[in-house]
Every structure is written in C-alpha cells, then in structure tokens.
Amino acid sequence: MAHLYVIAGHGAGDCGAVGYGYTEAERVRALASRLSTLGGGNVTIADMNRNWYADNGIMSLNIPKDWQILELHMDSNVPSVKGGHVIIEEGYSPDKYDTALANFISSFFPGRAEKIKPRDDLANPWRAAQRGYSYRLLENGFITNSGDLNKFNGQMGDLARGILNAFGIATASPAKEDSDGKVTSGGTSQDSVQHY
C-alpha cells in the first residue's frame, strides 16, 4: 500500500478551468478533501492555500521518497469533449500506480484516446522527476462537459475510492440499504429481522 501525497491544482487566486458555474480549483480541493476523509492516515493533503505550480512548491518539498504524489486537475475544452487520463513526465515508464489509476479513470470518465499521456511541457512533472519523486497528474474529466462534471459532483465518493484503490489504499465500505430497509455498513446487517 502506498502513501498518497495529494496536490490540488491551481488555487491561490488561480481558478483554473471553469464550467457550469464551477471552478477547477474548488472542485479538485473538494476531491482532495474526500480522498483525505476516505484514505485516513494513508493520505496527506498538500497545503491547499497554495498554487504548487506558481510557487514552485515541489522544488522545496521534503517528503519520503516512497510516497506517491498525485496532482488533481480537470480539463477544459468545447462541451462535447470528455474523459479522464493520467499525465506522467516524458521519458519515464508508467509504474503500477500510473497504470491502475489510468485504467480506473478511463473507465470512470471514458472518452480520451490515451489513458496515459507522457508530456515534456509541464513544470510539476519535470520538477518531481528532478527531485526523484514518483508523480502523476490526474485529469478528472472535463469541467466543460456536463456529463463529466455531473458525474464528478454526484459520484465524488466513488471517484475518490477508485483513486485510492489504484494506490492499494483500502477505504471504508459505503453504507447500503439491506433488504428490510435497515441501513447497514460494510455489508454487515444490523437487524436480522426478516419481513414477509
């Protein structure tokens, strides 16, 4: 199981992409908070009051080298474009976490031609590589696509669980309703009364 270090993209006055009354910076911070809640002690959230790109934060970062850095973003384009994918630094091979994350995000937010996209023109993947950190940037669908955005907002818990599972981080089972209408947790019935 990995320890996840989560950076929420944009912020500190930079709203990032916008769509349907939402900003990328606010949405990815909401997702980061959900990851923290569900992942517990296996997740550390980077200071969300910063813009880690603008202030060059990764270059002064001091975390254990075996922690996995995940930077959260949402894409923007014309409303018909959709889908999620993982970005890694050009010249590096995807590791098991990149692959698992890409498989999950492309099934949760389908639509992109490439699940994993190596890039050599982004600062934070390069900075993390220079510092020897394992890093990937996750595009959580398009904020400008109503389907992606509605799924992001309406199924954020499922999105967070899928991300955490890609890193081998177990999460609490969601509460479910038993056949007798009683709420159960973790698949264990709290009331064994059978109704006929």
How would you label these PLM feature ranges?
Residues 1-96:
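Catalytic-core regions of hydrolytic enzymes
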Residues 92-118:
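Active-site-adjacent substrate-binding region
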Residues 172-194:
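Ser/Thr/Gly/Pro-rich low-complexity, disordered linker/stalk segments of secreted
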Residues 5-7, 61-64, 69-79, 117-177:
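Active-site-adjacent mobile loop/cap segments within catalytic or ligand-binding domains
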Residues 26-33, 37, 99, 103, ...:
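Solvent-exposed, polar/charged alpha-helical surfaces in well-ordered, non-transmembrane soluble domains
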Residues 42-50, 111-119, 174-176:
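Surface-exposed patches in mature extracellular/periplasmic domains of secreted proteins
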Residues 1, 195-196:
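Short, solvent-exposed mixed-charge patches
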